[in-house]
From Swiss-Prot:
The keyword Cytoplasm does not apply. The lineage of its organism: Bacteria, Pseudomonadati, Pseudomonadota, Betaproteobacteria, Neisseriales. This is UDP-2,3-diacylglucosamine hydrolase. It holds the Pfam family Metallophos. GO terms for cellular component: cytoplasm; extrinsic component of plasma membrane. One of its GO terms (biological process) is lipid A biosynthetic process. It is a peripheral membrane protein. It is found in: Cell inner membrane.
Length: 240
């Protein structure tokens, strides 16, 4: 049976064209073209201020994902903490299906829970408070009514503050809370969890389930997880 691929945390931006090049290389590969599905679990872009922002980066990425979708490969997207404002307009343009924060998949007989991963980091209370605020639909609607320049400046300011705060936060609170994560997996009656966000690529064998953490993309490295009937494995981009 055809495999499924999982990626996240590419943080694409015009400042790092090498990351976009890595993505295009993967999307154009024969492996991706022969997949049953590709799942993008958030933070595809380093920031997103609205589907109405038209740029060469956004357009080229949407075009290449659409080409893959047009080949019959199902492409799914879960919003991340950087691109949570991606909406149906961009997803339609790219030929992607937008998924909720949590989804359960039947992958070759294994019930698999997928999410971006930021909701699992419950020890970072300041971030969870911030997340709750910015995910209010009314606030998002008001934000998207602002001129694009204002939104871009505000997003840049928020990123600067977030970067400074991250430098002084203890590393452990920026990882998933083990007890909460286990409860979520049990609540969805899953056998496996796949998430991103923490940038700590690894396959963990927890008590009663497997937790797979997708890594971030940087320089010449792309974190790509292949799932098929034999299990799940990270495969270097050179293999595609």
């Amino acid at each position: 049976m055809k495999p499924a691929y999982f990626i996240s945390d590419l943080h694409l931006s015009e400042k790092h064209p090498e990351l976009t090049a890595l993505l295009l290389r993967f999307l154009r590969s024969s492996a991706a073209g022969q997949a049953r599905a590709v799942y993008i679990l958030g933070d595809l872009f380093d920031f997103w201020v609205g589907d109405d922002e038209v740029s060469e980066l956004n357009t080229s990425v949407a075009r290449e994902i659409r080409k893959l979708s047009d080949k019959g490969v199902a492409v799914f997207f879960v919003r991340g903490n950087r691109d949570f404002l991606i909406g149906q307009d961009f997803c339609r343009q790219a030929g992607m299906t937008l998924l909720p924060d949590y989804s359960v998949l039947d992958l070759f007989g294994c019930k698999t829970l997928i999410c971006h991963g930021d909701t699992l980091c419950t020890d970072d209370r300041a971030y969870q408070r911030f997340r709750k605020i910015v995910h209010r639909k009314r606030l998002q609607k008001l934000f998207l009514m602002l001129p694009l320049k204002w939104r871009t400046r505000l997003a840049a300011k928020i990123r600067r503050v977030s970067k400074m705060e991250k430098q002084v936060k203890p590393a452990d609170i920026m990882d998933v809370n083990a007890a909460f994560t286990a409860r979520q997996v049990r609540a969805f009656n899953a056998e496996r969890l796949i998430h991103g966000h923490t940038h700590r690529e690894h396959i963990h064998h927890e008590n009663g389930f497997t937790r797979i953490v997708l890594g971030d993309w940087h320089n010449d490295y792309a974190s790509i997880l292949r799932v098929d009937g034999d299990g799940a494995v990270f495969v270097p981009l050179e293999k595609y």
